[in-house]
UniProtKB/Swiss-Prot annotation:
NCBIfam families: reco. PANTHER family: DNA REPAIR PROTEIN RECO. One of its GO terms (cellular component) is bacterial nucleoid. This is DNA repair protein RecO. One of its GO terms (biological process) is DNA recombination. The lineage of its organism: Bacteria, Pseudomonadati, Pseudomonadota, Gammaproteobacteria, Pasteurellales.
């Protein structure tokens, strides 16, 4: 079958695993093609330079070929030095990568999400206090990209504008409805307005945003637990 040679694309390694004795299967997130899997021939060989280049969080320039679902990597160059993710930021980066592996359709371009991903990694690498806001912002952008439409500014029951001092309960496929019930699905109006504006400036809003994104992402992730979350839990236990 005739091969198709792609142009250079910017991208990142999301995940990689051994394939045969000398090669790697590499899952990529690229600016134009989105998520795809490539075969990096000889990348595990002792003298291969690819082993050090094909690492998560390193901005790359990539080319590949092939018409089948599994492409063959033909060229790769580092576009910049690796983003310095360490400790909590590193595990957060693994979490973001796993999200993309789990929820994105293969070979579907998400150019705006690619920019959101780059901004998220930059935030994770910048300072510890930016980790949670960067994660929450990316999760909301990811949900929007997936077509998850929810109105944070209006009560789904009455259509009235959300009151920042009232509480609203989330109902899947409907939205937020004014309610006196307080449970895991209940949010203050001021939190909903902050979600809409992507403003995560205080700990209460960050916690509420994290609670909401876990609820919203569940329909895409299913019941299979995230490995990155389990690894982070183990890391935190070790730190104690």
């Amino acid at each position: 079958m005739r091969q198709v040679i792609e142009n250079w694309q910017r991208g990142f390694v999301l995940h990689r695993k051994a394939y045969s004795e000398t090669s790697l299967l590499v899952e990529l997130f690229t600016e134009e093609t989105g998520r795809l899997t490539v075969l990096a021939k000889g990348a595990r060989a002792k003298r291969s330079a690819l082993k050090g280049i094909l690492q998560p969080f390193t901005p790359l320039l990539l080319r590949w070929s092939g018409r089948s679902e599994l492409k063959t990597l033909t060229k790769v160059e580092p576009a910049a030095i690796a983003l310095p993710l360490q400790q909590t930021a590193l595990y957060s980066g693994f979490y973001v990568n796993e999200l993309l592996c789990r929820v994105l359709e293969p070979e579907t371009g998400y150019p705006h999400l690619f920019q959101d991903y780059l901004r998220c990694l930059t935030g994770l690498a910048s300072a510890e206090h930016l980790i949670e806001p960067s994660l929450r912002h990316f999760e909301f952008q990811l949900l929007q990209t997936l077509g998850y439409g929810v109105d944070f500014c209006h009560c789904a029951g009455s259509g009235e504008l959300v009151d920042e001092n009232m509480t609203y309960r989330y109902r899947e496929e409907k939205g937020f409805i004014a309610s006196l019930i307080k449970d895991n699905l209940t949010f203050y109006g001021r939190e909903l307005l902050a979600f809409d504006a992507r403003q995560f400036h205080d700990s209460a809003t960050l916690q509420a945003a994290k609670r909401f994104t876990r609820i919203a992402l569940k329909q895409y992730l299913g019941n299979k637990p995230l490995k990155s979350r389990e690894l982070f839990t183990q890391y935190m236990l070790y730190q104690k």
